[in-house]
């Protein structure tokens, strides 16, 4: 027994030492993992989308795009006044909303023309008159300046888009044929809603509403100038009386209803506000309500922010503002470019991944083609700044796909944060 005592003593001491040890643990932040699954059934021969350009040609479009520009002050009847509706601006030194629109549109139509079936409607239909009835006449067949194209090959579509650009460039900033009248938005939306060509179930259908003012001109408006708080008069100097008793009141509700009616017909409305009136006062709330009803969601990323006065939601990858707001030619061109990227049929062999859809590491992306896991390589697919680009035989399969024989592709991307 004595021979074992040292061993027992050693064990006792060892146990005591172990019992007295202490450990320091460093806090570790839990790993948050999110997975995004993107499923695409690709048909390379999808029909090209229809887009109706509904362009506001009201009198305010001839106002300066930058009223603070000293060159926009002109002599008129013995005093200095801001050029615009009453006195034409010298557009070389004082660009107007209309001339800025004319400068922004060509690139949009040229870059999108072969991918999109465009049409053009302007409003109001003043017929050159300046009275209340003429100023508030909504769009009609007479202001449907260019219908949807009959041919769909790239060259024909590009020529069609070029003709639409020529029509817009042909509307002068001053003189006969210049922008005149009010902003009968709800009635004009109702007109394009009734066009059979925009109700094509085999295509995506869009209306791009480009307006610089608050909607008005609704003679059936339930509000009147007799109640200024409810009327929210859109006429200068609170001019909602006589012929403008109802026509001059803000026509927000009917405009939203008109957009909802379009959406019920599977026609999405994209709203662009252009100028100071849509950026302040009642403007943002009205355009936001219309844009939300229109169903078009503005996507964004660090590379493609939402623009001045707006932010990108990193969780959804969408802008917090649903409508586009542009204050000058550059901002309008950017809005049109974003729309072009969103609506035209993309490169068939590219599946875009935006914002939160992208993995935090390329190794955390898994691709399935027709249910079969497909590793990345130069002959299968690669991840680039735009998304997943397919090459080789997979791209050939995509290009040969038809509505009857599409290609099913599934992307699973993991984000660690």
List the model feature ranges, each with a label.
Residues 1-18:
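Sec-dependent bacterial lipoprotein signal peptides
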Residues 20-417:
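P/S/T/G-enriched low-complexity
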């Amino acid at each position: 027994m004595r021979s074992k005592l040292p061993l027992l003593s050693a064990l006792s001491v060892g146990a005591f030492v172990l019992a007295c040890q202490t450990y320091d643990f460093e806090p570790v932040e839990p790993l948050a993992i999110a997975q995004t699954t993107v499923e695409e059934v690709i048909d390379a021969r999808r029909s090209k989308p229809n887009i109706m350009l509904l362009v506001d040609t009201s009198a305010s479009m001839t106002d300066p795009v930058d009223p603070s520009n000293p060159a926009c002050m002109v002599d008129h009847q013995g005093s200095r006044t801001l050029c615009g509706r009453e006195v034409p601006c010298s557009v070389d030194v004082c660009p107007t909303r209309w001339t800025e629109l004319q400068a922004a549109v060509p690139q949009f139509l040229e870059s999108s023309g072969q991918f999109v079936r465009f049409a053009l409607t302007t409003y109001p239909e003043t017929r050159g008159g300046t009275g209340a009835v003429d100023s508030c006449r909504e769009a009609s067949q007479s202001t449907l300046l260019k219908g949807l194209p009959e041919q769909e090959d790239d060259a024909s579509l590009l020529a069609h888009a070029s003709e639409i650009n020529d029509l817009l460039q042909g509307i002068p900033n001053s003189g006969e044929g210049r922008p005149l009248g009010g902003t009968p938005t709800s009635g004009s939306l109702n007109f394009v809603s009734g066009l059979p060509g925009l109700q094509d179930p085999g295509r995506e259908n869009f209306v791009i509403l480009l307006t610089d003012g608050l909607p008005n001109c609704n003679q059936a408006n339930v509000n009147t100038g007799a109640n200024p708080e409810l009327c929210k008069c859109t006429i200068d100097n609170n001019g909602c009386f006589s012929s403008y008793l109802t026509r001059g009141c803000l026509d927000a509700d009917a405009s939203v209803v008109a957009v909802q009616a379009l959406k019920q017909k599977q026609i999405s409305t994209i709203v662009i506000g252009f100028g100071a009136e849509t950026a302040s006062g009642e403007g943002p709330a009205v355009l936001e309500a219309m844009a939300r009803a229109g169903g078009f969601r503005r996507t964004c990323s660090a590379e493609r922010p939402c623009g001045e006065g707006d932010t990108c939601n990193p969780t959804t990858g969408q802008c917090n503002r649903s409508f586009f707001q542009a204050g000058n030619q550059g901002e309008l061109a950017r809005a049109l470019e974003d729309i072009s990227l969103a609506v035209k049929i993309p490169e068939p062999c590219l599946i875009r991944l935006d914002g939160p859809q992208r993995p935090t590491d390329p190794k955390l992306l898994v691709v399935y083609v027709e249910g079969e896991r497909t590793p990345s390589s130069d002959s299968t697919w690669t991840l680039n700044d735009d998304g997943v680009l397919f090459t080789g035989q997979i791209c050939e399969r995509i290009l040969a796909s038809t509505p009857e024989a599409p290609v099913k592709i599934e992307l699973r991307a993991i984000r660690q944060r």
